[in-house]
């Protein structure tokens, strides 16, 4: 199964959304303009632009944006000559009006994300997006926490609501090879021709490219990545590496390998505060199955309370915390601090 007559898969670059976590939501208008121009010039067909936690995410809980996200969406849409601009929406973080405003500002794809057992909360949002004429994509976040058959049922809910492509989303970078292909295959079998299937990976176990290939071989036709891994945790599937691997395997992406390598090195990297690294904390997230955007929050609270960020993330995994529960990291930090104080008495 191919995405289209011209492409075997369609790649979405999430540098300007997932990368917002790594940058603590401090993108400038100039950075967005330059990155969109470079990605568009390399042939990237879809570029996602929003606050890291989606439309309406600029808040005390998630972190405030340096530049209003709708301004960035507008700039991206005005800059791109061929690429479509996508926005991410988490029901409960953003509201339906945000979808309308995004479309007015030039977005043409609405990606709606829920926890992988809560697809039903997306029904009205998919309905609105389709009414507006937007292309729709659904995200089943934290897909490592549920078996294939559960994900297939949740994907059916999204597809019946109007979702045109359902993604298996490895939010924690915790899935390993066949765990990806088994989940993708189950959703492909459930949806048939009703909707496409996609995969969104993270590098917390250093498997994002390999996992993406397993997803493609299982029937996924839309794949996410970020140039230079620019994303939460250890980062996303590096688009430039994914394109190179796909070229070698004869998988058509429509992206120029040399141009995307240049864009990653010369344009995206200068906008990053530092490289996305597979360090101890990121590794713990993949191992313990922790939502990748928790990394910066955990590092900040660990410094504040004088405790181990790695241990905080392991405990977050034990508690099965999901996106939106970042505030519980403070409880974990205080718990560790009390244990340290007790141990020294």
UniProtKB/Swiss-Prot annotation:
Residues flagged as site, Transition state stabilizer: 17
Residues at which substrate binds: 17-18, 171, 200, 291
Pfam families documented for this protein: DmpG_comm, HMGL-like
Domain Pyruvate carboxyltransferase per the UniProt entry, residue ranges: 9-261
E.C. designation(s): 4.1.3.39
Record keywords, A-Z: Aromatic hydrocarbons catabolism, Lyase, Manganese, Metal-binding
Reactions it catalyzes: (S)-4-hydroxy-2-oxopentanoate = acetaldehyde + pyruvate
Ligase among keywords: no
Active site: 21 (proton acceptor)
Sites where the protein binds Mn(2+): 18, 200, 202
Family (UniProt): Belongs to the 4-hydroxy-2-oxovalerate aldolase family.
Name of the protein in its database record: 4-hydroxy-2-oxovalerate aldolase 1
GO biological process, one term: L-leucine biosynthetic process
PANTHER family: 2-ISOPROPYLMALATE SYNTHASE 1, CHLOROPLASTIC-RELATED (PTHR10277:SF9), HOMOCITRATE SYNTHASE-RELATED (PTHR10277)
Cited InterPro entries: 2-IPM_HCS-like, 4OH_2_O-val_aldolase, Aldolase_TIM, DmpG_comm, DRE_TIM_HOA, PYR_CT
GO molecular function: 2-isopropylmalate synthase activity; 4-hydroxy-2-oxovalerate aldolase activity; manganese ion binding
Record bears the keyword Lyase: yes
